[in-house]
């Protein structure tokens, strides 16, 4: 019998190949504000649905100027993104602080997987929006609502103003698809009083997200609402 001797470099190459081919995809699943995990409210550690880790809700010293809640997105004149009259909601009125809701997928997206979410907004002062984040907690895509504008930042392609046309019942549906080990595509669909679809690309591997609100006037129309989170299986 012939004995095969492998060098240290060869063993490392095999180990790296094995690791690359046994990576774990994010679990396909959904979450929404009507899940039983939020029956008593929404707080850090809450973990409804499938495919996600628990929420990390950070007030950053805002006190009563910031908060998180489960409520009816229509109550502030915004669009209906509810499931059984329930959506996630948050607010942040302190200009020096930010109200932040962080969450990770149970594993980063693999090539062929997508993540989607619906966001409802009314008033546009201050800053509020959404970050797609990589596993090293870096923002790799941003949608910001502020200064009477809706703007995409940080995207590899497609960044810029979506347009300044105001509608109280604006909904943004965001879909991110991991197309390679180094990036993916995003699609933004606006509905409500105005309709528009934009596309682009992002760099990095999607592993989670952040919603934020800061510096808005103290009126409920400035609440940020979102719902209907979903992770698809590989295609």
Residue ranges and their predicted role:
Residues 33, 117, 166-200:
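Carbohydrate-binding surfaces in secreted/extracellular proteins
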